[in-house]
A protein has these predicted regions:
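Cysteine-nucleophile active-site neighborhood
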Residues: 1-67
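Amide-donor transfer/coupling interface in amidating biosynthetic enzymes
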Residues: 11-17, 51-132
Length: 132
């Protein structure tokens, strides 16, 4: 974020203050987290609490590449509207070595299994992210 002067401020103005919808895809989803740990600890936007860490999947190939079944995570306050039309068992294609560990389970909308649960979709309010 710091590599592009004014980018973080512009994003915060639009998304936090004006509630402009935001969709982060792949690394864009990872930027939503509080911190990232790729090469060094780096602050993220902090819109979805959590950390991005290297996938730990003993016996499995990293980067994680391929089709995986989505598992829709049921939240206490009901499904997020972005999930309308998606069901557990639907497929998504992943190419990544790093995964978000979400702090608040209410923000985890879907995951895939790859040596354990791997975050696939996160969201809150008008902020969404997909790893695929």
């Amino acid at each position: 974020l710091s590599a592009v002067p004014g980018l973080e401020e512009a994003l915060r103005e639009a998304v936090e203050r004006r509630a402009v919808p935001f969709l982060g895809i792949c690394v864009g989803m990872q930027m939503l987290a509080t911190t990232g740990h790729e090469y060094r600890q780096t602050p993220g936007l902090g819109w979805i609490g959590g950390a991005v860490t290297r996938i730990a999947a003993p016996g499995l190939k990293v980067p994680h590449m391929g089709w995986n079944d989505l598992v829709i995570d049921h939240r206490a306050n009901g499904p997020h509207p972005v999930l309308d039309g998606l069901a557990t068992g639907d497929h998504a294609y992943f190419v990544h070595s790093w995964a978000m560990q979400v702090a608040d389970p209410a923000h985890l909308l879907a995951h895939a299994d790859y040596g354990g649960p791997v975050t696939a979709i996160v969201g809150r309010d008008t902020i969404l992210g997909t790893q695929f």
